[in-house]
A protein has these predicted regions:
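Acidic (E/D-rich), amphipathic helical modules within compact regulatory domains
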Residues: 34-77
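The feature marks the first
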Residues: 4-49
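Short, solvent-exposed interaction modules
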Residues: 66-120
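Amphipathic alpha-helical interaction segments
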Residues: 37-41, 57-64, 87, 105, ...
């Protein structure tokens, strides 16, 4: 079905819908609005912690519609913001509409779906520039099967 009559936009809508359906499924819900909120919170919290070039490399892997969400409200002159896991949890919980105690699980589930759809290199590059404790909040140990250990993990 064509939503816009523009093939590339329709494909982006289809891909975004597929991502949101997968994310909703990871949470055991059909609520796409919830899936959108947690995805947006995940994208923005990660984006604000990344250097400009790393953010751009990661965003290039996203469907066009989600790339727009990623960049929405972004101020590249103010990144990377320096915050750790507790500030990440506050931001994510506020924007996703979840409790802080749910952030690790929620972020991990979104990361699992994102990892299925973007190149390992782009996601690994983004996670590797973060402090280890923050990276492990976003992608809990054991989730990134086959991902090489970071030097600060050895």
């Amino acid at each position: 079905m064509s939503f816009t009559g523009v093939r590339s936009l329709d494909q982006s809508i289809d891909k975004t819908n597929a991502w949101l359906a997968e994310i909703a499924g990871e949470f055991g819900t059909g609520d796409r609005q919830f899936a959108y909120r947690v995805t947006r919170a995940w994208l923005h919290a990660l984006r604000d912690r990344l250097p400009v070039q790393v953010a751009a490399n990661f965003a290039a892997q996203l469907p066009e519609l989600l790339r727009g969400v990623f960049y929405g409200g972004w101020n590249p002159s103010k990144v990377p913001a320096k915050f750790g896991p507790s500030e990440y949890a506050l931001r994510f919980a506020r924007d996703a509409g979840v409790r802080e105690t749910e952030v690790a699980r929620a972020a991990g589930l979104v990361t699992r779906v994102v990892r299925r759809h973007v190149s390992d290199g782009a996601l690994d590059e983004a996670l590797d520039v973060l402090p280890l404790d923050l990276s492990q909040l976003i992608e809990p140990a054991g989730e990134a099967i086959g991902r090489p250990a970071r030097a600060d993990q050895m």
